[in-house]
Amino acid sequence: MPSFDTVCEADFVEVKNAVENTAKEIGTRFDFKGTSAAIELKDKEITLFGDADFQLQQVEDILRNKLTKRSVDVRFLDIQKAQKIGGDKLKQTIKVKNGIEAELGKKLQKLIKDSKLKVQAAIQGDAVRVTGAKRDDLQAAMALIRKDLADHPLSFNNFRD
């Protein structure tokens, strides 16, 4: 029986490269000379440092630009509020989403069930497996998911025939 998995995964090699390129650009830009603007990546979490809000915003814009150039969807980023870390310095954490949350998985499962397509959806950890009798039904399910859940960075993998 044909099937595929719906997942929400960022390419962490490309995320790491984008963070490194952002750090390199911060080091060479004139407007960041003599400031504490920096960026680092630890365990699927990006941390931005700066002296003021506008610096954090500039670093974030550079990061978004680098991620887009590397074909990483910026919807994977979960941006937290900036925090003061002593003196006038600020820190902002950006979490990189990985895996489908339970709420989104249930929404996806309900969407497929309500569509009256001849496919079944099952939540398997941080992925949703969709199985059906025909490939055409699976392709219709993929089109439905792309259309209705366009605000989530979902991708399809693990195709089986």
From Swiss-Prot:
MF term (GO), any: nucleotide binding
InterPro entries according to UniProt: DUF520, UPF0234-like_C, UPF0234_N, YajQ-like_sf
Record's keyword annotation contains Nucleotide-binding: yes
Annotated Gene Ontology cellular component terms: cytosol
CDD domains: YajQ_like (cd11740)
Keywords: Nucleotide-binding
Annotated Pfam families: DUF520
Entry superkingdom: Bacteria
Signal peptide, first to last residue: none
KW Ion transport (keyword) present: no
Protein's job: Nucleotide-binding protein.
Record family assignment: Belongs to the YajQ family.
Name of this chain's protein: Nucleotide-binding protein Daci_4781
